[in-house]
Each structure stands twice: as C-alpha cells, then as structure tokens.
C-alpha cells in the first residue's frame, strides 16, 4: 500500500467519526427548532431522533456481513447518494414521516461509514500503533461534537432554518466522497485476492464477551451520566449556564485526553492501562456524584480526561483477539456500544422519574464499576499479547 493511499484511507476514517459525532451531538441544539417547525412539543419530537440511533445500530450490525459482499468504495459512494437524498428530504418536506425516514437514512449512512472507518484503521495499523491511531480517529467524533453545535448556534441565531445545519454536516460526506477517487481499499470476502492456503477460521474467545459487555456498559454509563448532569447540577442550585459549562468542560477534556493518550498508549500494555483507566474513571465519577458544587468542575475535567481512552482501547483490544483483524468482531463490539446509546433514556428515564437525577448518576457509576471488573477479568484470558508478539517478529 502506497503512503498517499494510506493517508487518504486514514482521512476517510477521521471524517467517518466526525460525521457520526456531528449527527449525534447536534441533536440537542436543533431539537427545539424542529419541534417548532412541526408544531410539536419537544418531548414527542425527541422520540423521532430514535430513528437516527436505530439507523446507526442496524447499519453497524449488518455491515459486518455487507463488507464482505459489497466493496467498501462502492458502499461509500452509494452512501453519498443516500446522504444527498436525506438532506434534500429534510429541506423540502414538511411531513413528520419523511423527517423520520430521512433521520433513519442519515443514521444508516453514518453507521456504515463509521464501521468502515473503524475497520480501515484496524486493517492498516498493528499492535500498539493501532490503539493510538484508533484513539486519534475517535477524537474527531468529539471535535465534530464541539464544532457543529457552534455552527448550529451561529445559523440558528441568525434565523437560518435548522435544516441548513444538516446541509453543513453533509459537507463532511462530500469530503469523504472526494477522497474515494484514486484510492484503493482493502478487498474483503469474495473480492479478496485468492490464496492457495486455506483460510483458518479463528474462534473469538471469552475475551470478546468481556469486551462487548464493557463496551455496552461504558457507553450506557457515559451517556446516562452526561445526559443528567445538567438536571442534577440545577437541583444543587447551579444556573443553567453553569450546568451547561460542566458538560462542555467534560467534552473538551475528553478530546484533550484522546490526543494525549494517542501518544501515551504506545508505551503501555493495553489491557493493563485500560483496567487502570476504568478504575480511575469509576472513582472520579463517584467523587463527582457525592462531592460539593465547588469541586464539580475539577472532578468532571479529570473524569473526561481519564475516561477518554477507554472506549477505543476496548475496540482495539477486541480487534487484537484474533491474529487477523475480523470486521465481524470489530463490528460486534461496536454494535454493543451502540446498543448502549439506544438504551440511554430507556434505562435512565424511569430511574430519574422515580428517584431523581442523582440516582441516574449513581447507576452510571455502577456501570463504570462493571467496566472495571470486565477489564480486570480480561487480563486472564486476553490474546492480544501473543498476537502482538507474532506481528512484531
């Protein structure tokens, strides 16, 4: 593989995460405007965004098989066509059914693109370098999560219609589409070059189960926590502005942490540092949940920084449980994480209704403790060390 080709594929991976981050995180910014547009209460409008999450979940799950049937370049180019149709649907329709369908299509496109992006990184890089590259790729999710809400605020403040926010997000896919030209993608399944040696099917092992549970609990815990921090902070007498600043600080610190750990991870065994970070994150979340408002800003900054590397390290270790990175395995771990996203309000909504926001934060804390236990148990069964030894010879 030529260096320029590798750079193009790496940028496609970066932008695939930016696309998903922009679509998921911008929701809160535009929801009120969309509710006004359709003359609906915000609470019923939020349910239609489930179509976005459902599209992401279904496409990540199915793409484990689709990757071996439909070439990656074809998928990305077809995704561009779907993206144009979805944004056009948002712009020119006044029907809630069409809006929901467009959201589902956006979810499908972003899920397919993100699973391809993840697979490209696991395919192009080996060992510890894979972990740091995947972490840097994931930082584009957070970066888009910071940039696009600012773009949305800028447009909405000037009374520009909300659908132009999605048109701006579509520009990320335009860049991906342009990068596919003159770029060679790894061939999979029936398109892969034929070899005389029989393909040995590897068993995944129990380590994948531990990592999948950790991925689900981590994302469910993280989103369950950050979704209810503003309500919890307001209950302690903080202003809405200060409560919002806590969330912004978390994501800013999370992004800085990703950049820092993309360098730091190269010097450590991934399973050991993952266990340490998961334990630290659980402790820091407990400090935030039981601390005074005066210490909240510092504890959430520390939590964002030290938890930033957990999810991508889980995915990296998943890809290292087999000698050859398996798209099915990587997508399985990703799917478990996405199920965590889908369950966020299903799990935390009733808890908040019955026991208040702090109960939701403590539940999230319990989920982080489960992540720590899974990472600790992984140490006894993980195959990443033997596979790293093989690739280094």
UniProtKB/Swiss-Prot annotation:
Q: Which regions face the Cytoplasmic side of the membrane?
A: 1-10, 72-77, 122-133, 183-205, 266-272, 318-331, 382-393
The signal peptide, as residue positions, is: none
Q: Which GO terms describe its cellular component?
A: plasma membrane
Q: Does the keyword Cell membrane apply?
A: yes
Provide the primary localization: membrane
- What is the induction comment? By selenite or tellurite. Maximal expression was detected at concentrations of 10.0 and 0.5 micrograms/ml for sodium selenite and sodium tellurite, respectively.
Q: Name one GO molecular function term.
A: transmembrane transporter activity
Kindly give the Pfam families that the UniProt entry links to this protein: MFS_1
Q: Where are the transmembrane segments?
A: 11-31, 51-71, 78-98, 101-121, 134-154, 162-182, 206-226, 245-265, 273-293, 297-317, 332-352, 361-381
- Membrane topology for this entry? Multi-pass membrane protein
Q: Which HAMAP family match?
A: MFS_TsgA (MF_01044)
Query: Of which family is this protein a member?
Result: Belongs to the major facilitator superfamily. TsgA family.
Indicate what this protein is called per its UniProt record.
Answer: Protein TsgA
Annotated source species = Escherichia coli (strain K12)
